[in-house]
Amino acid sequence: MRGPVQLLVKWCFPVCGRHRNGEYRATRPDTDNLQKLLKDEMTHAGFWRDDAQVASEIVEKFWAVTPGIYIAVRELGEKP
């Protein structure tokens, strides 16, 4: 990808204790720390030339029965 992109990420952590599936996680790690690592690795893997191309980000953390990371990247066009 060469131009600006939008990055949508959902961090899904294993359900534990009193937490329920789909509940937002409001504890550490911080989303900014998670995102920095992810964007650096995605740059290294060749998803884009530079993580500065990420012009829009949506980041959420959840407790989930099925843990993992959901990632969607889309190129952004010019705003009218």
Question: Where would I find each of the regions flagged by the language model?
Answer:
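Acidic, proline/glycine-enriched N-terminal capping motif
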Residues: 1-80
